[in-house]
Curated annotation (Swiss-Prot):
Signal peptide as annotated in the record: none
One annotated GO molecular function: ubiquinol-cytochrome-c reductase activity
Quaternary structure and partners: The cytochrome bc1 complex contains 11 subunits: 3 respiratory subunits (MT-CYB, CYC1 and UQCRFS1), 2 core proteins (UQCRC1 and UQCRC2) and 6 low-molecular weight proteins (UQCRH/QCR6, UQCRB/QCR7, UQCRQ/QCR8, UQCR10/QCR9, UQCR11/QCR10 and a cleavage product of UQCRFS1). This cytochrome bc1 complex then forms a dimer.
Protein's recorded name: Cytochrome b
Topology versus the membrane: Multi-pass membrane protein
Family under the similarity heading: Belongs to the cytochrome b family.
Residue numbers binding heme b b566: 97, 196
Top-level lineage group: Eukaryota
Length: 379
């Protein structure tokens, strides 16, 4: 009798994706982040579901309902902080996952890569809308500033902003619709992640060497299941340390002040994971230019495959490209720091230089260095 695991229509899908899947024998811990993102997503959906049971999306009661969750609901405080810090863990895993893709040339699988970019945008949109829900000062003013950026679109901008707001300012209608979108988007992300996986399994995983590994495959289970479980345990350990020891470390104190349209906070800034993009936005004095730079700072990932000039896939054996890659990482950390600083000298010029360097590395230096490396190897 054949194994039910291999014949049952549903079990067969699970089997071919997580059990009998042929995987390269040499994929390192950098390949763990896909499964970690899955763990993050499930965790966020579950904690979010329990929060939604007690949250009210009305301007008069939203802030109070979050306080009520933390004070009166059984274990509400831990659910709330797991959800808030879970978002930070989600983005740490996302950035490392995308960084791995850039380093090892995983972008050479265009369908998987492009769906990954759509996923990145979807997660960013979800996180932004989630940050608005507690209806603190930073929630309100963050929503006002970011939605206002759409008014930079010529001709239809103002109408578009008022349409999104559902009125002439960020108000009750805005909060209600943001809650609706924040609830539905994670399920769309879940579906997209399944498609992401589907396309990945069409080609099989890349590996650190960048060389096809068809001749050297091992079954996913038990080798990579145990590895993913270890990674997941480590993720939960770090998350729980953050939640139980310093839950407000990554948050903004201003968000403990209820939203007040008559009082602007001295420094409006988004959560830490958006600061690099916020720094790029602020580094251009023109509103439309800033918005375009902001969008292109993420969308640039879509043209990375077109800029691949190297004869090798990954950067494992390309020391010059490696130097550029780590310069890019340092540049992004600099942008993250600048995004959280006030708009004054010397932060303005540092932000502008870091923004120029970010685009220069990806669009100019990387392709040129790759050609130089090809010539050095006489390829």
């Amino acid at each position: 009798m054949t194994n039910i695991r291999k014949t049952h229509p549903l079990a067969k899908i699970i089997n071919n994706s997580f059990i009998d899947l042929p995987a390269p024998s040499n994929i390192s811990a950098w390949w763990n982040f896909g499964s970690l993102l899955g763990v993050c997503l499930i965790l966020q959906i579950l904690t979010g579901l329990f929060l939604a049971m007690h949250y009210t999306s009305d301007t008069t009661t939203a802030f109070s309902s979050v306080t009520h969750i933390c004070r009166d609901v059984n274990y509400g405080w831990i659910i709330r902080y797991m959800h808030a810090n879970g978002a930070s863990m989600f983005f740490i895993c996302l950035f490392l996952h995308v960084g791995r893709g850039l380093y090892y040339g995983s972008y050479m699988y265009p369908e998987t890569w492009n769906i990954g970019i759509i996923l990145l945008f979807a997660v960013m949109a979800t996180a932004f809308m989630g940050y608005v829900l507690p209806w603190g000062q930073m929630s309100f003013w963050g929503a006002t500033v970011i939605t206002n950026l759409l008014s930079a679109i010529p001709y239809i901008g103002t109408n578009l902003v008022e349409w999104i707001w559902g009125g002439f300012s960020v108000d009750k209608a805005t909060l209600t619709r943001f809650f609706a979108f924040h609830f539905i988007l994670p399920f769309i992300i879940l579906a997209l992640a399944a498609v992401h996986l589907l396309f990945l399994h069409e080609t099989g995983s890349n590996n650190p060497s960048g060389i096809p590994s068809d001749s050297d495959k091992i079954p996913f289970h038990p080798y990579y299941t145990i590895k993913d479980i270890l990674g997941g345990l480590f993720l939960v350990l770090v998350l729980m340390m953050l939640v139980l020891f310093s839950p407000d470390l990554l948050g903004d104190p201003d968000n403990y002040i209820p939203a007040n349209p008559l009082n602007t906070p001295p420094h409006i800034k988004p959560e830490w994971y958006f600061l690099f993009a916020y720094a790029i936005l602020r580094s251009i004095p023109n509103k439309l230019g800033g918005v375009l730079a902001l969008i292109f700072s993420i969308l640039i990932l879509a043209i990375i495959p077109l800029l691949h000039t190297s004869k090798q896939r990954g950067m494992m054996f390309r020391p010059l490209s490696q130097c550029l890659f780590w310069l890019l990482v340092a540049d992004l950390l600099t942008l993250t720091w600048i995004g959280g600083q006030p708009v004054e000298h010397p932060f303005i010029i540092i932000g502008q230089l870091a923004s120029i360097l970010y685009f220069a590395i990806l669009l100019v230096f990387m392709p040129i260095i790759s050609i130089i490396e090809n010539n050095l190897l006489k390829w």
